[in-house]
Swiss-Prot record:
This is ATP synthase subunit b, chloroplastic. It comes from Cuscuta exaltata (Tall dodder). PANTHER family: ATP SYNTHASE SUBUNIT B, CHLOROPLASTIC. The keyword Coiled coil does not apply. It comes from the Eukaryota.
């Protein structure tokens, strides 16, 4: 990034007789300089940002796929539990015909227990998916803001030198003096 900035600054030292050059007077060309800096940031930053987002998207998709695989495992357990429930129901009906009320109670308890287990499995699956999505969204946001801040600091450090800094301070002091004279 510093080489790109240096190449633009070196254009300002060319003679203006029949050639292209940049005016480095910050007060006279502030919109032009800002548009050039923004153009360079957008040009070089969009590739990095799109790569970052693509990588993050792949990670998110992989995590979602893993969560779906866990969900498939939960569905398999659910099917086993349903099969067991059907078996217990069949056995309970046979014992009911024979008049065993204790078996009826066990059937009811097993059905209730299985139903509670199935409901808990479904709730756990949904909670896991929701938690993973929130965690991934938070990580993407944190990484995006961190990289944006690092790029902005790097750009400012590479573009700001002592002379420019002193001229900006002097101009701001002059504006404050003018404002004070107007208010007095």
């Amino acid at each position: 990034m510093k080489n790109v900035t240096d190449s633009f600054l070196s254009l300002g030292h060319w003679s203006s007789a029949g050639s292209f050059g940049l005016n480095t007077d910050i007060l006279a060309t502030n919109p032009i300089n800002l548009s050039v800096v923004l153009g360079v940031l957008i040009f070089f930053g969009k590739g990095v940002l799109s790569d970052l987002l693509d990588n993050r998207k792949q990670r998110i998709l992989k995590t979602i796929q893993n969560s779906e695989e866990l969900g498939v495992g939960a569905v398999e357990k659910l099917e086993k539990a349903r099969s067991r429930l059907r078996k217990v129901k069949t056995e309970a009906e046979q014992f009911l015909v024979n008049g065993y009320s204790d078996i009826e109670r066990e059937k009811f308890n097993l059905i209730k227990s299985t139903s509670n287990t199935l409901e808990q499995l479904e709730n756990d699956k949904n909670e896991t998916l929701r938690f993973e999505q929130q965690r991934l969204i938070y990580q993407v946001r944190q990484r995006f803001f961190q990289q944006a801040l690092q790029r902005a600091i790097g750009t400012l450090n590479s573009c700001l030198n002592n002379e420019l800094h002193l001229r900006t301070i002097s101009a701001n002091i002059g504006m404050l003096g003018t404002i004070k004279e107007i208010t007095d």
